[in-house]
């Protein structure tokens, strides 16, 4: 009986490997050809400055990298624990391969791209980056043990962030444990897992949190209009490569604290991840309704830094300052903020017990809640501190607000 079981296992493993090889065959050939072109360009001295979601414009991103020995308040890895964390989380990480239409001088043709996803429910909901699945004609998902789902569907995308949820028909997947990104600190050790370069599934890298609250502009390189401003990002020196987009950034407890999103090709060891807490509200909405909506309050703010505080003569050096511009009013009409009585020049310092600045931006902290939830804002107005309860609504594209 044991002999038959081993033979059956070997046969099944061989079939799985064959399926995986066939699945990535076209992608490998395409990337091999593309790699040759890139090497040829380098030999003649061409330096590419194209910004993409894996190529960040450094001029728009103030970066300060901490030394690898920096102290953090969270638990760090011990010898062997990186492998333990990787073994714990890898079953919850999937590879994503998309088929897209490519327009050229010769007409329309098909292309392939690859990314990574995080399983967030046993019945097949998967979290990834929006840019991984945008414009895809077909989405295929491969689990860490080689199971292939030929057609995944897009459930929803975040209108304000590079986040998407997709769904496969499953009933017994292993969901990842999600941590609290509000408590991470610079110097804390982390692990990244992903489908590196679209060819090396379940690649493991490690590093530290180099900084938090980073802002940057990213694009998939297809057009100027594809550029997207990303705020409140986690900076890490854990290696993040093309194909890692949508994969998890993990703490020493084996909890997902970020979604790996971007890196830069013109500097080493600089990658960025979206804080996981900022997508928990949409996740709750997805799991409860099967649709997924982003919560918002409808107020236009600027994050307060010491420089902003000086420029606007503000009494605090952190928080969210409600301001107007020539194009937009400070409070969206009929929004939750308007109904709650928020005003221009208010300074929001807390969302419930979370402090804006130390624990994240206003937008990021609101992202932890779903439409219909009520949050308590701590507000500084004309030198007086008050609390205002706001019942969140679902974001609408016409609202023109990031919060």
Language model features with spans:
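Flexible, small-residue-rich helix->loop connector segments that border functional cores
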Residues: 85-86, 345-348, 377
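Serine-dependent protease modules
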Residues: 3-5, 29-36, 40-311, 316-318, ...
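Intrinsically disordered, low-complexity Ser/Thr- and acidic-rich flexible linkers and loops
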Residues: 105-107, 326-335
